[in-house]
């Protein structure tokens, strides 16, 4: 499918870790927010993870963020502004990890807390 063809081009796949997978692409020309290029639940999430892994696209486990992105953002759309900070943390880590793999200097620390507003979490705050 066209969606699966987009996965190898993604910068990161954010997972839940098994039920949801959301592939994001950020064009670093600074003209917009990261976009959801693929997303899936259960079997489709597994396929997205497998295609990502086969193409060296980093997988990043962040359950509340994965659920929020999966539930709120359509494929091909930019992420909403109030999820930008959380996604930026993940992308910054992914880019630092790539640099680490190339240079073997200063392994980055994965972010562990994400500011996901209550209305995206799908639970009662």
Model-derived regions: residue spans:
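Short, charged, intrinsically disordered terminal tails
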Residues: 79, 83, 95-125
């Amino acid at each position: 499918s066209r969606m699966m063809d987009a996965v190898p081009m993604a910068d990161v796949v954010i997972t839940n870790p098994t039920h949801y997978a959301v592939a994001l692409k950020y064009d670093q020309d600074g003209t917009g927010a990261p976009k959801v290029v693929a997303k899936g639940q259960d079997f489709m999430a597994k396929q997205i993870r497998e295609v990502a892994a086969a193409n060296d696209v980093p997988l990043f486990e962040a359950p509340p963020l994965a659920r929020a992105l999966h539930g709120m953002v359509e494929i091909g759309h930019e992420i909403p502004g109030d999820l930008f900070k959380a996604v930026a943390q993940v992308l910054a880590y992914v880019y630092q990890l790539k640099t680490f793999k190339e240079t073997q200097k200063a392994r980055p620390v994965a972010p562990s807390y994400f500011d996901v507003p209550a209305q995206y979490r799908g639970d009662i705050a």
